[in-house]
Each structure stands twice: as C-alpha cells, then as structure tokens.
Amino acid sequence: VNPRLVINDRGNWYTFDALLEEFTRGAQTRQDRVYLIWENMRRNLYHESPLFADNTPHDPVRLMNIFGSNLCDDAGNAGCSLYHHGGFPGSRNRALHGHVQCEALVDPDAEFGLQFMDIDMDAFYLDRENELPLDGDVIAQDHDLARRELNYGPEVNAFKASDAPAALFRPDDGYAHPTLRCHEI
C-alpha cells in the first residue's frame, strides 16, 4: 500500500510530471511558467545542510517529497531539471564562486534569453527597467544589479547587504546542464 495525501489539489508530487504540472498551474505565458517554478520551489524548500553529501537530493521528486531542505546545488539542479522539462530546454546551472543556481533559457533568440532564478537565496535580478530577470553574465559585468535585491527574501533576522552575493558573479563562472528526472514515489 502506498498512501497518497493530496489536499485541495495540492501536494501531488509523487511523479515528476505531477510535480511539474502543479508547479506551473495557472501560467498563461512562458514567463509565468518561469516565475511559478521558481516561486513554488522556493516556498517549499529550506536552506539547510542536506542529509546526504552526494547528488541524491538533485532529483526534484526526492528533494520535494523526502528532504525538503537543501543547499544551493540541490535546489539549482532540481530547478534546472524542472525548467528543462517544463519547456525550457537549454536551461543550465551556473556555478558561481561559492554558489550554484539555475538559469532558465526562456527565449534563445533574445538578448537576455537566460534568466538567473535563484531558488536557494529567494532572488532573481531584474534589468534596469525592472521588467525581466537577467542572466548571470550581465550581473557579472554589473554587480549593482544584484546589490539592489534582498537575498533570502523579506523574512530575515537582520538586513544584510547584498554585496557578498553580488561578488559571487564573475566572468569565469562554470556551467552544467542537469536534466535529472527519474524517481517516483
């Protein structure tokens, strides 16, 4: 017997497809899908040391159902996989200097086609007109774009300047393209 608990059509995260469907429910545009995946992941994860030091929490189904806590690489890998299979192939993880997070490839033909969506630190960095999230390459060239944001959201113990997260972006950041989707509960 495998009991399932789904309340008000929420929490059916037992398969990758069901998790992705719930996380993008209500999206009317591609940009909505990007924001909803980011929002649903960050709302349901806690920044905490993982139980396992390996890649076990990189699977979105395991991360959301079993662990619920993570460090940046776990959230980044799971988020990148959701973006990739959610209609954004070419999405990637950006390995900054001390942080890892996903960039959704929203529009491959646009100047800012990639959007750095930091699930772990509850932030994304908007262009100067505050219209669209930027990719890490732009932020690496202009750290002020990251300094304007409050990382870890509005609920923090004390205000901390965003200088440290901004300094993580550099022109020599690395990349990975995780697309893991294998576990079912």
Briefly describe each language-model feature range.
Residues T29-Y35, H85-S91, P108-L114:
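Loop/turn elements at helix/coil->beta-strand transitions in domains of secreted/extracellular proteins
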Residues H47-D107:
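Active-site neighborhood of thiol-dependent amide/isopeptide-bond enzymes
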Residues L19-E22, V34, W38, N55, ...:
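Generic ordered-secondary-structure signal
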Residues L96, A104-I185:
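His-Asp-centered catalytic microenvironments across diverse enzyme cores
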Residues V1-F67:
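Secondary-structure boundary elements
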Residues R30, G68, C72, Y175:
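Aromatic-acidic/polar surface patches that form glycan- and anion
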